[in-house]
């Protein structure tokens, strides 16, 4: 039996997916919550939020992500970073997954990736879990109901958490699998209930497709000045560095919190919702995000709550530090309806420095911006990936290596060209540790970070006095109104300044060692600013 609204010429049967139980097409939020409750997938929370846990997988599994190696993509995929799967292995995986799905009920959402119709793709999401359908309905963009009657997908994603892959048969690394086949326009996800795999699979897809159209795909959040979309800012950063928090600024219009494209027309959100970390979420520091946790249909993932009152515990990380909430963009009162912006006037590269060495903000030249973009230094924050329990310093090129199917210089050259053409000012912002490394120092105060960003975005910071950083060569402001001067000089925040010097030298060497891999592919001006 099928129910819901769907193109009668584009049902699952028309795609060769047959023998399922009930298929529910394009259910809206109330029906999806009703189905999820009936199936025992979660609990109804305050305000109508939906509370779920995801079992042993509470973060992404980047090592289980595979790209099918066919002739059409063999020369364009970055194989050092993307595990290959044979076409035969994928075909066997597909057949076995469909056999596993026989007789079971499935939920289908027909959605769009990309707010700019010139560059958007149609995505069909087929999920075993009703709440996954609700999640992706929030996170991607929803077509008008009447448009569903003629919807045809460019790509299809099938997510079946109860299916376990066979590494020997399918050519994957474990029972968990995310397999992308660009020739068959198909993505298969199995063996994990973590909802973030759904959205990141579509992000990876766009990251492969858009560079061929001259569009720079970015792992970033974005906002613009009220009434002035030309004054757009983008915030690059890995999970947990502050993209969602810092872009949700009551004084600016939110374009999106995680995935964007930069075309010749400007900036556009790939998504239609947000996926925010909720650990230690504070109603005073982050009122907009906090308010979404008690709104109807918000998905609350892996949060401890009181069984009787359903009150959420924002400080209990016993399930995971990677607790999250997913909600549609319109739940943020100052969100952009169009999800479009101008060419970035300011580019902020967020890093979470667990060494406690980097300043809270630094101004970058275009060459330095290219260097730091390719380096992608940050710390993996606890819980965001399987097995990460405390901050781990890492270099993740383009501030999103797990989602970049092409070689880093493809994205780096796009960024270089667009900065040169549109004259963006670039900043490096450290949201990590100050006064010492992780375990000794403390996290950078969010009020200080917000004050520095406000000064950068309104242009006043450009008028400040700057000093040249002796370790990294970038410009650091000496004083900024509303920010303690000592905070701007990391060495002064350490009790033992000799220990700081050793730590800084260690980080400089890490930068130098990591960047060796990019030297053959970069211009002389970037080589000239290389650290170490």
UniProtKB/Swiss-Prot annotation:
Binding residues annotated for Mn(2+), in chain numbering: 200, 219, 258
Enzyme class at the top of the EC tree: lyase
Pathway it works in: Carbohydrate biosynthesis; gluconeogenesis
Main location: cytoplasm
EC number: 4.1.1.49
Family annotation (Gene3D superfamilies): 3.90.228.20, Phosphoenolpyruvate Carboxykinase, domain 1, Phosphoenolpyruvate Carboxykinase, domain 2
InterPro entries: PEP_carboxykinase_ATP, PEP_carboxykinase_C, PEP_carboxykinase_N
Positions annotated to bind substrate: 60, 194, 200, 324
UniProt keywords, alphabetically: ATP-binding, Cytoplasm, Decarboxylase, Gluconeogenesis, Lyase, Manganese, Metal-binding, Nucleotide-binding
Reaction catalysis annotation: oxaloacetate + ATP = phosphoenolpyruvate + ADP + CO2
Co-factor(s): Mn(2+)
Any coiled-coil regions, as ranges: none
Cofactor mode of binding and number, as noted: Binds 1 Mn(2+) ion per subunit.
GO terms classed as biological process: gluconeogenesis
GO-annotated molecular function: ATP binding; metal ion binding; phosphoenolpyruvate carboxykinase (ATP) activity
GO cellular component: cytosol
Location of the protein in the cell: Cytoplasm
UniProt keyword annotation of Isomerase present: no
Binding, ATP: 200, 219, 237-245, 286, 324, 449
CDD domains in the record: PEPCK_ATP (cd00484)
Functional note: Involved in the gluconeogenesis. Catalyzes the conversion of oxaloacetate (OAA) to phosphoenolpyruvate (PEP) through direct phosphoryl transfer between the nucleoside triphosphate and OAA.
NCBIfam families: pckA, PRK09344.1-2, PRK09344.1-3, PRK09344.1-4
Similarity annotation: Belongs to the phosphoenolpyruvate carboxykinase (ATP) family.
Protein name stated in the entry: Phosphoenolpyruvate carboxykinase (ATP)
Organism: Ruegeria pomeroyi (strain ATCC 700808 / DSM 15171 / DSS-3)
């Amino acid at each position: 039996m099928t129910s819901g609204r769907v193109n009668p010429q584009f049902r699952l049967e028309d795609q060769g997916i047959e023998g399922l139980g009930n298929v529910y097409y394009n259910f809206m939020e109330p029906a999806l919550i009703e189905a999820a409750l009936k199936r025992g997938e979660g609990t109804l929370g305050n305000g109508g939020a939906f509370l779920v846990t995801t079992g042993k997988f509470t973060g992404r599994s980047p090592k289980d992500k595979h790209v099918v190696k066919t002739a059409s993509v063999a020369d364009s995929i970055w194989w050092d970073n993307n595990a290959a799967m044979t076409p035969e292995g994928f075909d066997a995986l597909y057949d076995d997954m469909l056999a596993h799905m026989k007789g079971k009920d499935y939920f289908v959402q027909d959605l769009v990736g990309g707010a700019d119709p010139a560059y958007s793709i149609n995505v069909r999401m087929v999920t075993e879990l009703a709440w996954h359908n609700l999640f992706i309905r929030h996170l991607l963009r929803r077509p008008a109901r009447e448009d569903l009657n003629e919807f045809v997908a460019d790509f299809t994603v099938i997510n079946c958490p109860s299916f376990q892959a066979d590494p020997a048969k399918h050519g994957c690394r474990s029972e968990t699998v995310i397999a992308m086949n660009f020739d068959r326009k198909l993505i298969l996800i199995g063996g994990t209930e973590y909802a973030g795999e759904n959205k990141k699979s579509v992000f990876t897809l766009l990251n492969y497709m858009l560079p061929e159209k001259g569009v720079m795909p970015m792992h970033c959040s974005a906002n613009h000045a009220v009434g002035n979309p030309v004054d757009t800012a983008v915030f690059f950063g890995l999970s947990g560095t502050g993209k969602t928090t810092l872009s949700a600024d009551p004084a600016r219009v939110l374009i999106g919190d995680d995935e964007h494209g930069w075309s010749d027309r400007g900036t556009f959100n790939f998504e239609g919702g947000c996926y925010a970390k909720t650990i230690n979420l504070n109603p005073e520091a982050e009122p907009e995000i906090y308010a979404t946790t008690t709104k109807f249909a918000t998905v609350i993932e892996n949060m401890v709550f009181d069984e009787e009152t359903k009150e959420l515990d924002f400080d209990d990380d016993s399930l995971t530090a990677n607790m999250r909430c997913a909600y549609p963009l319109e739940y943020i009162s100052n969100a952009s309806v169009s999800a479009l912006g101008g060419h970035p006037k300011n580019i902020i590269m967020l890093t979470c420095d667990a060494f406690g060495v980097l300043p809270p903000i630094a101004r970058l030249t275009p060459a330095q911006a290219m260097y730091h973009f390719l380096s992608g230094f940050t710390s993996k924050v606890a819980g965001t990936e399987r097995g990460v329990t405390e901050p781990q310093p890492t270099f993740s090129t383009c501030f999103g290596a797990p989602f970049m199917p092409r070689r880093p210089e493809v994205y780096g050259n796009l960024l270089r060209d667009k900065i040169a053409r549109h004259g963006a000012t670039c900043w490096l912002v450290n949201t990590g540790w100050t006064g010492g490394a992780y375990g000794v120092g403390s996290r950078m105060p969010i009020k200080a970070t917000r004050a520095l960003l406000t000064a950068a975005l309104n242009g006043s910071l450009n008028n400040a006095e700057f000093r040249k950083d002796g370790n990294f060569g970038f410009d650091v402001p000496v004083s900024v109104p509303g920010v303690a001067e000592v905070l701007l000089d990391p060495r002064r925040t350490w009790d033992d300044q000799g220990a700081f010097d050793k730590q800084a030298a260690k980080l400089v060497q890490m930068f130098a060692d990591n960047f060796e891999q990019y030297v053959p592919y970069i211009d002389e001006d970037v080589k000239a600013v290389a650290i170490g």
